């Protein structure tokens, strides 16, 4: 039976972050994901790296400070999939007075270390404003955007780069302590193949299933309860041609973002709704759609209706239950619980957390685990560059560099590769000298060479992995085109698995 230093269960952002950090400190690491990387909460966020301006109202100063400081760290770690964005906050005096917002923004500017992101300012909305004419003033501040699913992917690739192992579609079915070690059982959900490992330590980073794995996988009492809070978003054709996002205040004191996305679209969200069902079955409700449309329409001149929605997505935030009365008041901070058996076989469990603070969460997790691993390496992730991030400049600069090296690339394709794969693009293009060398075009410039790369290097096994998480090609591909991808994948994955087996 193979023995690992650490087995991490859960392939979302926290699991991938902890696994990458541990592997980089010299531990032998295995990460297990029951479905696909980032298949739940971690691909259903607002796609922001932000301090969380509204958390200041709930006195979450530690969380906000840590998140603010992480923005510029993550921009340097993943410049191909993260970039700064300005946010405009229309002022509505009956909701929050200007002095309160100014104080909040002053704290936002100064709570975290900020060297490259510009500070907040007041703004006047003139005749060319996209907002309703009665909204004449507001504020503007800095946060950042990130491709959430690809941030998870980049961390999983880092696990492998540092000598670890990542298995997707491999469900951990049981874990128990035995003779000072963990015995972990798992099963391939496609083939039924059974696995058995020993591990010196175990991490439960299963997100919405963290308590369920305590109950059913380990038969241990969970140290904390969790509350599942659903957040839903709607996607519509681009509502304005400005680069800025908008943060809208609503009568219920909640806020809604309107975020420009991929040139053609705007993301509007999110909601905060208590959720009691299966996290895998989460979906938007009509009441949430109506809520988001109502908040948007109260602010913008361009009005939207149900028929304008081109896509929706929902996720469940597994928040540590602090007995708050309302979903929006529950802390977004994380709690790390660790316990062992006679000083051996530690179990570290993750409750809560935000996309923005995943790296610090992982660092704190390793601080708690370090005493169990004499000789473990030091913290290292703050100055690392994630796979794909070696672009030496901006995403636009790298797209131009790609077109110089591969002059057959269209501007849109070079931009897609730059913003999706960054410096890993050269694994896709190789020695190609024409578009014909990239193989079949499945639609919207989604070529066979890209899909091969996704299978070979990014754990893609299903169509939805490729077109909704590694990329967002699903926004453009027809049902017929998606069916063709499914056929191609079935044949290629089978061939891929046979070659690996041999």
Per-range role (PLM):
Residues 2-4, 191-201:
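Core beta-strand elements of the Rossmann-like FAD/NAD(P) dinucleotide-binding domain
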Residues 2-14:
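Beta1/beta-strand and adjacent pyrophosphate-binding region of the FAD-binding site
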Residues 23-44:
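Glycine-rich FAD pyrophosphate-binding loop
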Residues 47-128:
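Dinucleotide-binding Rossmann-like beta1-alpha1 core, especially the glycine-rich loop
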Residues 142, 148-150, 158, 218-241, ...:
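C-terminal catalytic lobe of FAD-dependent flavoproteins
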Residues 168-182:
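A conserved short coil-to-beta-strand element within the FAD-binding core of flavoproteins
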Residues 204-219:
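Flavin (primarily FAD) binding-site architecture
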């Amino acid at each position: 039976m193979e023995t690992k230093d650490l087995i991490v269960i859960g392939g979302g952002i926290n699991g991938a972050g902890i696994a990458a950090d541990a592997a980089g400190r010299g531990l032998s690491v295995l990460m297990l994901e029951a479905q696909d990387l980032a298949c739940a909460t971690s691909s259903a966020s607002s796609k922001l790296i932000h301090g969380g301006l509204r958390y200041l109202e709930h006195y979450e100063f530690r969380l906000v400070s840590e998140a603010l400081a992480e923005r510029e760290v993550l921009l340097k770690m993943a410049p191909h999939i993260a970039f700064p964005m300005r946010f405009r906050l229309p002022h509505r005096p009956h909701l929050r007075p200007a002095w309160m917002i100014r104080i909040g923004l002053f704290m936002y500017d100064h709570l975290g270390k900020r060297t490259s992101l510009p500070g907040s300012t007041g703004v006047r909305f003139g005749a060319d404003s996209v907002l309703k004419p009665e909204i004449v003033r507001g504020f503007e501040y800095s946060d950042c955007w990130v491709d959430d699913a690809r941030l998870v992917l980049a961390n999983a690739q880092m696990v492998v780069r540092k000598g670890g192992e990542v298995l997707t579609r491999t469900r951990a079915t049981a874990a128990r302590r035995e003779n000072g070690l963990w015995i972990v059982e798992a099963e391939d959900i496609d083939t039924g193949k059974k696995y058995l490992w020993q591990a010196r330590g175990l991490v439960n980073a299963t997100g919405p299933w963290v308590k369920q794995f305590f109950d059913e996988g380990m038969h241990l009492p969970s140290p904390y309860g969790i509350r599942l809070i659903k957040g839903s978003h709607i996607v519509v054709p681009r509502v304005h041609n400005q680069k800025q996002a908008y943060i809208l205040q609503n009568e219920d004191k909640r806020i809604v973002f309107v975020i420009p996305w991929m040139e053609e679209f705007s993301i509007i969200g999110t909601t905060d709704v208590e959720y009691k069902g299966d996290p895998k079955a989460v979906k938007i409700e009509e009441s949430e759609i109506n809520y988001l449309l109502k908040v948007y329409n109260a602010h913008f001149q361009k009005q939207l209706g149900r028929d304008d929605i081109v896509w929706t997505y929902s996720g469940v935030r597994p928040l540590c239950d602090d007995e708050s009365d309302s979903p929006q008041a529950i802390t977004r901070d994380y709690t790390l619980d660790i316990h062992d058996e006679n000083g051996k076989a530690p179990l570290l469990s993750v409750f809560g957390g935000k996309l923005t603070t995943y790296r610090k969460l992982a660092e704190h997790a390793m601080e708690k685990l370090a005493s169990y691993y004499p000789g473990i390496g030091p913290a290292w992730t703050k100055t690392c560059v994630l796979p794909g991030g070696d672009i030496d400049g901006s995403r636009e600069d790298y797209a131009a560099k790609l077109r110089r090296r591969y002059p057959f690339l269209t501007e849109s394709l070079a931009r897609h590769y730059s913003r999706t794969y960054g410096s890993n693009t050269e694994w896709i293009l190789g020695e190609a000298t024409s578009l014909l060398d990239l193989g079949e075009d499945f639609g919207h410039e989604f070529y066979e060479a890209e899909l091969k790369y996704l299978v070979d290097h990014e754990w893609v096994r299903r169509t939805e992995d490729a077109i909704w998480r590694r990329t967002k090609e699903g926004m453009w591909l027809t049902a017929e085109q998606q069916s063709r991808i499914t056929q191609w994948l079935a044949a290629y994955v089978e061939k891929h698995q046979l070659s690996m087996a041999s």
